[in-house]
Every structure is written in C-alpha cells, then in structure tokens.
C-alpha cells in the first residue's frame, strides 16, 4: 500500500484521468441542459452587454482574495515551520487550486499543497498537510458566522416553509460536521482512533489483492507518528492567539470580498440583486460546492443559483450570464495559472 506522502499526487491525477474526464463530460451535459432551459440566445444577449469596468473589477477582487489567501497560509506555515517566499507560496497555492478544480469535491488541493511543500521546500508532508488543513479551518470560521446569519435571514424571505427548513437544516448540519472535524483534528486520541480505524480497513481491503497480505502491525507505529506530527502542527496553528486573530480577520475579509465579487458579476450584466437573497444564495452555493460530485461543482451551483434567484425575481438568462462572468475570474483563470504552475513543478521534480 502506498501512502499519499510516498506517491505523487500528479500520478494520482494521471491514474484517475478517466474519472476526471467523465466528470467534466457530466458537467458539460448539466450546463447544456441549464443553458437550454434558460435560453442560449438570451444568455448570449445578456453577456454582450457585459460592462468591461465591472468585469475588470471582478478580476481585481479575485486577485485580492488570492493574495489574502496566500498571506493566511504563510502566516500558518510560519508558526509550524518556515514558510517559503510569498511568490513561491502563491504559485504553490495556484497549483493546489488546479488540483481542487479538476477533482470532484475539491479533493486534490490540500494533499497537493503538502506534497509540493515536501518536494520543493523540504517541509515534512504531515506538517504541510496540517498547515493546509488549518488554513481551511480559518476559512470555515467566518463561513459559520455567515451561514448562521443566512439561516436567520431566510426566515424573512418570501419562500415556502419547507425550503426554509431544508436550507436551514443543511446550513446547521454543515456547521456541526465541520465543528466535529476540527475537534477531531485537535484531539490526538480521537484523531489516532479514526486514522487507525481507516488504515486497518484499507490494509484489510488491499490484502485481498496482494499475495501474502499486508501486516497492519508493520505500519501501526508509522501511522501514530504521522498523526502525532499532524496533530501537533494543526493544534499549534489553531491555538496560537496571534495567528487565530489575524487569520480570522483575513478570512472574514476574503468572504466579504467574495460576496461583493458575486454582486459585481451581476452588475456586470446589468442586474442589481437584493442584498438579503444574495447573501443567502451565496451561502447555499458554497454548501453545494462542498458536495463531492462534480469538479468545481460546475453546473450544480449554477442550477441552484438559477432556481433560488428566480424567487428573487432575476431571470435564468441573467443568472447564467453572471455565473459565466464569475467563473471566468474564480475558476477558469486560476485553474489555467495553476495548470502552468503544476507543469513547471512537475518538470522541476522530474529533472
């Protein structure tokens, strides 16, 4: 059995290229269906009137968000290890965004960050993974506040009681799930128990396909060692008061800018959405992006936005046009930059 630390994440992407290709084919079908019902002609007409000023502002806001993201990760890395220079760290972040955006449920980004830190900077894998995981925790804290606000605001929205209940429950369940994950990450005994349980099952499963089987006793101590290193790094980053306060406000600023950016995307196509529905729908869109179904939740998020903004009185053609403006800056551009960075690091490590 080969661990993520010992194998290339690029190899993982290569080995799973069929699944990735099929996922993007599914994305194409979903987007085609949404576009068909919204009206391709109407969407194109909405896009033809796109304001270049707001389009440029969309890219500026996304660039600021990415800079803040790099600053937050660097802040955490400097607590658990020595962080590389800002430009190098930002390129590593772009590479991880590429991994996130081509794998369903954004499953490839955090291991890819840890892997590249080890290969390029010599940072131990478990420390790099702890830093990228802690980085996601800081992202979750303001999201939890926005989600609670959305759960309250949705009660004032003129929609069916069942829609209010479903969205509110979805928000609260997500908050509870993340809270449990953070608690498990900071509690060494629970983290060890979960890791050993998962490892034992994996060893049992792989033993069926390997002659002579695999000894669990042989990797037990190694699992404990890595979990302890991960737990120490994760806890250090989360419990450092200075890092926590600065990281929290950076994350809050990132979320505020992202909500503003979505608003700007609608302004770009000539629509001004009401503030309360925008915050609620933005939160639901983030929740949908967590589902490990399609890469980048392409199509799924658009479908949800079309349905929810219809309640706010905004037509599907304008919602889809705003989504295109949004995806150009938040998905296509970072993914292409990340692809170039991934190719660069791949060649560097090969040579």
Curated annotation (Swiss-Prot):
Record's keyword annotation contains Membrane: yes
Source organism of the structure: Methanothermobacter thermautotrophicus (strain ATCC 29096 / DSM 1053 / JCM 10044 / NBRC 100330 / Delta H)
Membrane topology: Multi-pass membrane protein
Stretches that traverse the bilayer: 20-40, 51-71, 137-157, 165-185, 244-264, 275-295, 304-324, 328-348
Keywords of the record: Cell membrane, Membrane, Transmembrane, Transmembrane helix
InterPro entries, per database record: L-PG_synthase/AglD
UniProt-annotated location(s): Cell membrane
Domain of life: Archaea
Any one GO CC term of the record: plasma membrane
Protein name according to UniProt: UPF0104 membrane protein MTH_887
Family listed: Belongs to the UPF0104 family.
Pfam families listed in its UniProt record: LPG_synthase_TM
């Amino acid at each position: 059995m080969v661990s993520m630390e010992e194998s290339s994440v690029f190899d993982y992407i290569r080995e799973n290229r069929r699944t990735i290709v099929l996922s993007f084919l599914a994305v194409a079908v979903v987007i085609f269906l949404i576009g068909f019902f919204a009206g391709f002609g109407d969407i194109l007409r909405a896009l033809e009137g796109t304001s270049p000023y707001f389009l440029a502002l969309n890219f500026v806001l996304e660039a600021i968000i990415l800079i803040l993201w790099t600053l937050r990760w660097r802040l955490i890395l400097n607590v658990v290890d020595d962080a590389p220079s800002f430009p190098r760290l930002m390129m590593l972040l772009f590479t991880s965004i590429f991994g996130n955006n081509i794998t369903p449920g954004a499953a490839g980004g955090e291991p890819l960050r840890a892997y590249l830190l080890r290969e390029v900077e010599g940072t131990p894998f478990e420390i790099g993974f702890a830093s990228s995981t802690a980085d996601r925790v800081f992202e979750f804290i303001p999201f939890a506040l926005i989600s609670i606000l959305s759960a309250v605001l949705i009660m004032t929205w003129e929609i069916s009681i069942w829609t209010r209940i479903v969205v509110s429950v979805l928000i609260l369940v997500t908050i509870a799930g993340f809270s449990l994950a953070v608690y498990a990450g900071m509690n060494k005994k629970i983290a060890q128990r979960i890791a050993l349980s998962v490892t034992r099952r994996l060893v049992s499963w792989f033993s069926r396909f390997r002659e002579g089987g695999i000894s669990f006793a042989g990797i037990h101590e190694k699992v404990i060692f890595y979990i302890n290193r991960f737990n120490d790094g994760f806890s250090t980053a989360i419990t450092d008061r200075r890092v926590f306060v600065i990281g929290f406000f950076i994350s809050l600023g990132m979320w505020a800018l992202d909500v503003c950016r979505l608003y700007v995307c609608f302004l770009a196509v000539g629509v001004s959405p009401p503030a309360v529905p925008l915050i609620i729908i933005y939160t639901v869109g983030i929740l949908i992006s967590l589902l490990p179904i399609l890469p980048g939740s392409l199509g799924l998020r658009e479908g949800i936005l079309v349905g929810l903004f219809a309640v706010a009185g905004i037509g599907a053609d304008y919602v889809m046009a705003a989504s295109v403006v949004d995806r150009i800056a938040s998905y296509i551009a970072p993914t292409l930059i990340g692809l170039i960075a991934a190719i660069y690091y791949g060649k560097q490590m090969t040579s």
